[in-house]
């Protein structure tokens, strides 16, 4: 707006040489310029806000991440538009007085004009060549974009590593403690590691369902200035993974924050998970193993692991009712004794300051894990005195599911894996194609892709659905701004050409396409259209001034005048 008003003042002074403009005429010029610019400002604001409509419609993690950006930008644009048409004219009336210096008096302007003028003259002289070069650059950028990988969000370096190995479901407390200590010692031997904190199993809360076989070790790294020369975080993970190859343990590598987000959002603790739904746990496990075998040779798939639905150990105690009646016992007598021996029974309370703790008593772990000792659990019979549990019950260890997982009332298993050294979109698409081609699912069984890939697909669907609608709204806004389909199309057609620079930058910088990159391109849409609106407004103004000077005729206006 400031530049627009300055140009109007300069034209008046050129037309009225040595004639002083009075205050009323100066205010009139400011008012006329503001009216001329306000329309472009309004529609530019509408267009930029409209271009961010896809961001407002994002859901899930991507919505929570980018909604603040979209709202902040929108509020700033609305306030800026209000200030441009209200406060700016008032300030201009106070401060834009006196003689105006020519634009070339500024050294920066002189430099820019010196660079820009020969370029624009060459482009106007060779118009077809200029258009052809841009079309070729646009056509080349399309396969470049198509060749880029896809991911949900660019990985963020948390300056820490989360090591999540999984052992066999029937691992004992003693063995898991030994494995945990060995792993911590090996991890601490790497020079870049500052601190190591590992845990096995779950906390004593109802919200933590981690089995004893799942280890979580947080590895805090030293500042990068203290790392060995030339080493990267990826190399540290590879070194640790090579050193931590323990039989019966499947390693898993991720980062603490993103892991918690994945687990809370999808229930999958890796980058990608294949949820297998069905009716029988044994069939689900067999199907999961078949899926795993198809994924083993796919590039980029790491830490491949099948969530166990079998392998848990259970104690089955089958009571013999005839023997119970012979000894004068009831089923409740046996159940209460077994419950106290294995599960524990309240014994007493202890008070420490203002806190009170209950104490339970049960058999030691070695006793509970021994079948012979379990058979000798004493029962008090009113007819025969003390008898062993084996006298009235058959006791045996049986295999079963360590954990039964279901979603929407359907039993579920899972095949989980992380993706490294390759983009998520290409890796998962190859896995989907291979599974669809080589695996026939039984009736009543189906699979569902989850994890970060689930977020990627959801974000893509929203963007692909709403972007065409946004382009239509932008075109209508341009039409109402210019009252011309040709000028509206002229402003809109600059969008794909504006993406050329972004496409080349993303490609040569080695960045995968993601929701974050898509939001960046959306912002570029609005800026490109806004620039087109401003240029069309100035071109129309310049043409109107030319018509006033030379008339609206081919005989009076030459091609050189139009170029000038």
Predicted regions and their residues:
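Signature of alpha-helical transmembrane segments and their immediate interfacial
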Residues: 30, 35-37, 49, 104-154, ...
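Helix-loop junctions and hydrophobic alpha-helical segments within the transmembrane domains
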Residues: 2-43, 113, 460, 548-564
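Hydrophobic transmembrane alpha-helices and their membrane-interface caps
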Residues: 1, 5, 9, 75, ...
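Short, hydrophobic beta-strand segments
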Residues: 159-169, 214-231, 262-282, 313-325, ...
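Hydrophobic, glycine/alanine-rich multi-pass transmembrane helices and their short helix-loop junctions
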Residues: 42-94, 452-456, 472-481, 498-525
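Solvent-exposed, membrane-proximal periplasmic/extracellular interface segments of envelope transport
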Residues: 174-268, 293, 322-344, 351
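Extracytoplasmic/periplasmic membrane-proximal domains and adjacent transmembrane bundles
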Residues: 19, 23, 252-254, 285-470, ...
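Transmembrane helices with small-residue packing motifs
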Residues: 55-65, 135-171, 226-228, 257, ...
């Amino acid at each position: 707006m400031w530049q627009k008003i300055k140009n109007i003042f300069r034209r008046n002074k050129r037309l009225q040489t040595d004639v002083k403009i009075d205050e009323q005429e100066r205010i009139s010029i400011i008012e006329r310029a503001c009216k001329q610019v306000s329309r472009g400002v309004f529609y530019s604001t509408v267009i930029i806000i409209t271009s961010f409509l896809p961001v407002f419609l994002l859901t899930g993690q991507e919505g929570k991440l980018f909604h603040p950006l979209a709202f902040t930008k929108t509020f700033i644009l609305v306030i800026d538009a209000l200030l441009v048409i209200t406060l700016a004219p008032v300030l201009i009336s106070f401060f834009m007085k006196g003689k105006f210096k020519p634009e070339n008096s500024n050294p920066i302007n002189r430099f820019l004009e010196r660079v820009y003028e020969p370029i624009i003259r060459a482009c106007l002289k060779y118009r077809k060549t200029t258009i052809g070069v841009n079309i070729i650059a646009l056509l080349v950028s399309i396969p470049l974009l198509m060749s880029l990988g896809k991911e949900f969000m660019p990985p963020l370096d948390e300056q820490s590593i989360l090591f999540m190995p999984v052992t066999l479901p029937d691992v004992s407390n003693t063995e898991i403690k030994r494995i945990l200590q060995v792993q911590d010692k090996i991890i601490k031997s790497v020079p870049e590691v500052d601190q190591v904190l590992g845990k096995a199993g779950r906390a004593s809360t109802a919200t933590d369902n981690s089995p004893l076989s799942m280890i979580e070790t947080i590895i805090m790294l030293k500042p990068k200035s203290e790392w060995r020369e030339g080493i990267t975080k990826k190399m540290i993970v590879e070194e640790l993974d090579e050193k931590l190859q323990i039989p019966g343990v499947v390693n898993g590598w991720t980062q603490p924050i993103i892991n918690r987000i994945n687990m809370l959002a999808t229930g999958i603790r890796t980058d990608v998970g294949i949820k297998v739904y069905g009716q029988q746990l044994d069939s689900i496990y067999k199907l999961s193993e078949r899926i795993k075998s198809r994924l083993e040779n796919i590039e980029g798939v790491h830490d491949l692991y099948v969530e166990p639905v079998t392998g848990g150990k259970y104690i089955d105690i089958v009571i013999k009712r005839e023997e119970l009646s012979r000894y004068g016992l009831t089923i409740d007598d046996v159940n209460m004794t077994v419950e106290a021996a294995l599960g524990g029974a309240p014994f007493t309370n202890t008070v420490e300051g203002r806190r009170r703790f209950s104490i339970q008593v049960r058999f030691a772990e070695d006793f509970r894990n021994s079948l012979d000792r379990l058979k000798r659990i004493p029962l008090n019979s009113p007819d025969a005195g003390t008898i062993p549990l084996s006298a009235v019950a058959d006791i045996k260890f049986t295999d079963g599911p360590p954990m039964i997982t279901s979603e929407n009332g359907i039993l579920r298993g899972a095949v989980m894996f992380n993706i490294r050294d390759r983009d998520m979109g290409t890796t998962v698409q190859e896995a989907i194609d291979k599974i669809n081609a080589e695996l026939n699912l039984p009736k009543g069984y189906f699979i569902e892709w989850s994890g970060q890939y689930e977020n990627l697909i959801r974000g893509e669907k929203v963007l692909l659905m709403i972007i065409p609608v946004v382009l239509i709204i932008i075109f209508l806004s341009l039409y109402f701004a210019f009252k011309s389909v040709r000028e509206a199309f002229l402003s809109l057609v600059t969008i794909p050409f504006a993406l050329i620079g972004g496409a080349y930058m993303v490609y040569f910088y080695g960045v995968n396409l993601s929701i974050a990159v898509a939001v960046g391109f959306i912002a570029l849409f609005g800026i490109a259209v806004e620039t087109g609106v401003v240029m069309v407004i100035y071109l129309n103004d310049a043409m109107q001034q030319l018509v006033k000077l030379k008339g609206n005729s081919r005989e009076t206006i030459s091609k050189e005048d139009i170029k000038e």
